[in-house]
Amino acid sequence: MRVLTGLQPSGDLHIGNYFGAIKQMVDAQEKSQMFMFIANYHAMTSSQDGEKLKQNSLKAAAAFLSLGIDPQKSVFWLQSDVKEVMELYWILSQFTPMGLLERAHSYKDKVAKGLSASHGLFSYPVLMAADILLFDTRIVPVGKDQIQHVEIARDIALKVNNEWGEIFTLPEARVNEEVAVVVGTDGAKMSKSYQNTIDIFSSEKTLKKQISSIVTDSTALEDPKDHENCNIFKIAKLFLDESGQKELQIRYEKGGEGYGHFKIYLNELVNAYFKEAREKYNELLEKPSHLKEILDFGATKARKIAQEKMQKIYEKIGL
């Protein structure tokens, strides 16, 4: 079963990115054909700063590799290194009704938040469809806010298949409900937009500051505390197995510890969990040529599959 996902190189990764998406990708490597790319074309909808995009792409590659993406088990590449995706994007646009794109929630939301209403942003779902359909993807792991884009890709695939025969595999969105939403320091969904993140590769000083900012209620130190509605507990349980969660729950119910104690505990959890990943991340950033070699290795494999797919499409469209 082929699984594909792409993540934009939009700066520092946070634990919401990891538990909401990256961990599932790493786990999927053992039982599925995992295709993963750094979506630098998509990132251009929010920034056209070339040097920043280049550096963020290298940082993203280092981050994903340090967190467990294995280029020997997964096909891992930079989106712009497989040009066929832009060719398919143009072809698919001929099968995409304007009304389908006008109904896209993501476009409306981003424009409402002040992002420029460019053609690139408007047609973002068509490029995402090209990413998915080019590789005959069966499963697309996404957050709830991206389900509609996978549905659009499926609609486009059906329209093309009705015209040309069964040329595209119909994709399905997969949402991990258990970690569909990772709460941020303010209790809302963790997001860079909300400035409520706990960043994976930040300094220990920054990490401590972010965890210290977690919003809690005013329950006194000596009193029992409600773990179910506590943002610290909601984040901490991501790092704990069932017995660890139970032990922490008992500490909450017993009383005698303040939220400051639990923040110190969470800080220790996060530091220990990502210690090796941080070390590897810093090592990789010092070797940009090695990162490029890894991305080139993945792009070669992805390009071969893409070219074979495009050859079939050329025959259908007369190119």
From Swiss-Prot:
Motif segment ('KMSKS' region): 189-193
Arranged from A to Z, the UniProt key words for this protein are:
Aminoacyl-tRNA synthetase, ATP-binding, Cytoplasm, Ligase, Nucleotide-binding, Protein biosynthesis
**InterPro entries attached to this UniProt entry:** aa-tRNA-synth_I_CS, aa-tRNA-synth_Ic, Rossmann-like_a/b/a_fold, Trp-tRNA-ligase, Trp-tRNA-ligase_bac-type, Trp-tRNA_synthetase
Main localization, broad class:
cytoplasm
Under CDD domains, the record lists:
TrpRS_core
Q: Which residues bind L-tryptophan?
A: 131
The answer to whether the entry has keyword 4Fe-4S is no
Q: Which GO terms describe its cellular component?
A: cytosol
> Any signal peptide, and if so, which residues?
none
What's its EC? Answer: 6.1.1.2
Q: Does the keyword Electron transport apply?
A: no
Which sites bind ATP? Answer: 8-10, 16-17, 143-145, 182, 189-193
- Renumbered ranges of motif 'HIGH' region: 9-17
Superkingdom of this entry's organism?
Answer: Bacteria
Q: What does this protein do?
A: Catalyzes the attachment of tryptophan to tRNA(Trp).
- What does the record note on quaternary structure? Homodimer.
What's this protein's family per the entry? Belongs to the class-I aminoacyl-tRNA synthetase family.
Q: Protein name, please?
A: Tryptophan--tRNA ligase
